Amino acid sequence: CGLCRRLKECYGKRGQLTLSYDMTFLIVLLTGLYEPKTIAGETRCIAHPLEKHPTKINEYTDYAASMNLILSYYKCKDDWIDERKKKGYIAAKALEPKIKKIESNYPEKVRLIHSKLEEINQYEKKGETNLDLMAGLFGDIMAEIFAWEPDAWELSLRKIGFFLGKFIYLMDAYEDVEKDIGNNSYNPLKEAFLQKTPEQFATECRT
């Protein structure tokens, strides 16, 4: 709830719509490690209007909100560039005014995120099927996001972010494979899915 609230306060309702569980996990992780001053409160929202929900906000909440917005912004841009999805164009344009401030606050992180997403995009255009390569690129993005600062925790945080990023990429590919086949969209698992029965495919992915 704290992340949702800060997304709305910092970036408006459109920012609030970018809420993700991976950035929520990042807040919990960084807060547990660094034990920053945290402000506890309560809030109501459209999703749960009848009762107040507890919120906890600290510097990592704002950081995660910024990273959340950057990832969503580039995703929307890619949707427009690759598939000419009008929703992607509209969403990217709506988020654009907020992006410049994030770029100035976290220039190195934004630069790496943008570079890796561009790399992913280029491989997608080539129809790359190397799962480890593709998942690893998104893992690099999450590794950079999870590394809050160069300190004793940095290496461990990068490892957590990297492998979580790989898992997220693979799970998204697995869940979207049938939809992507129907839409003729890129998915590194398409070839494997088409060569097997759904049951065989599911079993192989689980193992």
Regions found by a protein language model. Give the residues of each.
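Acidic catalytic motifs of isoprenoid enzymes
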Residues: 1-159, 166, 170-206
